[in-house]
């Protein structure tokens, strides 16, 4: 057999291998989610969050550096990246089964004993055990590996989205706690000054023991808040170090929370299904479903005959010097067919497992879409509520601070008691602390909205 004949045979085998597949058609998914966003979700002609780079969304340069450090050093993200490399390698291994494995061989056979010593030399090129994929078993296994690779890659993008959002939220939390600590420490100093005055008046008989006790209560309350916030700030720093993969430069840490840190989170423009399908976790679930579908095709193909081809062409000679002389050519062609007859129900069990895996993947895909809709709807609803809370909280702080100033003036004029002044100070202090907590919740929810809409994958939009 000439080499050209062997090549023609291999080409024919490859063509036949691409003829059919027993995988079922991809299942149409119609998850039970509303066709529109909740009424409180304001619509706007804005870009999708997935198209907004995280450097465009997080506008503070210090925060950008912290996020960049986290993306470079975070161990969880590193594991996700390595999983992508592993899945890519597994796909390449599986894909290699779709083409013949051609190998060059060389052999020397020397025999002796009572008879004279004989030598035989051979060299050739051949194909070993190439499966003629008439029913799509190998192709479906390759498709399943490809979809698994796509799913792992989508999970890697989802890991990056989560890391960006968690790092930004932790950074803002540190800033809010740092600002609350400054307010608490300033309040402690003010209350301590008031306590010294109250003690002096009490010694002169100018105030009651109740007034002195209430002042001490305010001092200890503020000291407790300051101690708690110092501990919380240390925990915030540790959380940031874990996310960033190492200690941060103190110059990158915020000392307050500012509304200018974030760009406004874009509300979703379009139908829920269109927006949610851009989320990497939903994309990963979809690829898992496609992989499970392909595995059904491979399990079905296992019921049919398997045809393998082995062939070689080369040269053989009793002398090494004459190995490639005329008349020394040798060839072999060995087709093999395997027909499953009895395997104790193994093939049916494998098919049942593949069908169950597909049904599980379908349920998980539907759940991921429903969960994505709920997360987005919750963030949209909370966005409106927190905007209202922030506006109301600002008015409360302004009113409390004005009441504190008026109470101080009336106390200085002898019109109000010291207890009334202490109540006004306590109200102003609590209002300031509550305002910072509301601002943090407002910005954290904007980060959540950005994340659940699929934002944070690109560095720049």
Task: Place the predicted regions along the sequence by residue.
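Terminal intrinsically disordered/low-complexity segments used for targeting and assembly
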Residues: 2-72, 146, 230-277, 283, ...
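Periplasmic alpha-helical coiled-coil/stalk elements that build and connect Gram-negative outer-membrane
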Residues: 138, 154-271, 382, 427-428, ...
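Short segments within alpha-helical structural elements
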Residues: 188, 195, 221-251, 299, ...
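Small/polar, glycine/serine/threonine/aspartate-rich low-complexity segments that form flexible
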Residues: 43-45, 49-58, 63, 105-130, ...
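Sec/SRP-type N-terminal targeting helices
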Residues: 79, 95, 132-160, 210, ...
